[in-house]
Amino acid sequence: MADTFVAKNWRDLIKPRRMEVDQDSATPTYGKFVAEPLERGFGTTLGNSLRRVLLSSLQGAAITTVKIEGVDHEFTTIPEVSEDVTDVVLNLKEVLLRMHTNETKTLRIEAEGPKEVKAGDIITDPDTEILNPGHHICTISEGGKLRMELTCRRGRGYTPANVNKVAGSPIGTIPIDSLFSPIRKVNYQVTNARVGQVTDFDKLSLEVWTDGSVSPQDAVAYAAKIIKEQLTVFVNFDETEEPVVAEAPKEEAKLNENLFRSVDELELSVRSANCLQQANIKSIGDLVQRTEAEMLKTKNFGRKSLKEIKEILAEMGLSLGMKLENWPPKQAPAPAQPKA
């Protein structure tokens, strides 16, 4: 179990209120996300980590091999087809897929000229979608025929052609390079954020471009989940045994008589007391329902005042950010009678 004082290493840090999405610029393939406030340095730490995971670790689908009827290798031509095999393979690499299964699938193209063959001409099954059906693959002349089989699967990152080569494949099967990542580009920027009178916080702005097989918002969520799962091995204690006052049962919070005391009884510094008075916080019950971010927005209220109040509340078994239903109560509890 984590020691109470050790737990302050992470519980005392400011957390971002939420992740905001720029709805004005959002598209199915682009998203801009903003998280603030963050402790100084956390903007770069989180931004760089999310960027690396987004670009390297998210799964996608891609074509891995192609077999063209009448073709034995990629360094040749196809009768009545304008593009040679190398050009056709290059065009197939840019076909965007979405797969709803982890199984390897075989797709087909069966076309006769004259015709411009596009990605939309690929014959799929219910588990596979073509996301860019207008993408050009090749052009067949009058009298020409094209038959090909395409193998596709899910994966992550980049896989070179030699890795996609499967032992025992029929002669004429051509392995191709596969870019599985659904992420096309990621940018992040860290700027200053203000919380009340304090300006030494970070604001993280993250821009994500995808190929359309996953939404930018889902991509960020998946990346954050990957980071979270990878970091759990470094936590060498069980925090579930540590009681968190802010999440205590509401019945216990109501029975804490300190909630009904005036904040004047806290013996705060003059600055802190004036800030509470200015914010119209009269009782400790009013105080504990304020979050750290809300307190820091109070004029002249800084980190020193925040630390002072948190330490005093902790001695009472209370904390900021508590949720008290039906506050203030209609009738405060009677003061405890002295023992005989």
From Swiss-Prot:
GO cellular component, one term: cytoplasm
GO biological process, alphabetically ordered: DNA-templated transcription
Enzyme class: transferase
Coiled-coil annotated spans: none
SMART domains, A to Z: RPOLD
Spans annotated as Alpha N-terminal domain (alpha-NTD): 1-238
Keyword annotations from UniProtKB, A to Z: DNA-directed RNA polymerase, Nucleotidyltransferase, Transcription, Transferase
InterPro entries assigned: DNA-dir_RNA_pol_insert (IPR011262), DNA-dir_RNA_pol_RpoA/D/Rpb3 (IPR011263), DNA-dir_RpoA (IPR011773), RBP11-like (IPR036603), RNAP_asu_C (IPR011260), RNApol_insert_sf (IPR036643)
Catalytic activity as recorded in UniProt: RNA(n) + a ribonucleoside 5'-triphosphate = RNA(n+1) + diphosphate
EC number: 2.7.7.6
UniProt signal peptide: none
Span list, region Alpha C-terminal domain (alpha-CTD): 253-340
GO MF assignments: DNA binding; DNA-directed RNA polymerase activity; protein dimerization activity
Domain free text: The N-terminal domain is essential for RNAP assembly and basal transcription, whereas the C-terminal domain is involved in interaction with transcriptional regulators and with upstream promoter elements.
Subunit structure: Homodimer. The RNAP catalytic core consists of 2 alpha, 1 beta, 1 beta' and 1 omega subunit. When a sigma factor is associated with the core the holoenzyme is formed, which can initiate transcription.
Function recorded in the entry: DNA-dependent RNA polymerase catalyzes the transcription of DNA into RNA using the four ribonucleoside triphosphates as substrates.
Family affiliation: Belongs to the RNA polymerase alpha chain family.
Name of the featured protein: DNA-directed RNA polymerase subunit alpha
Gene from which this protein is expressed: rpoA
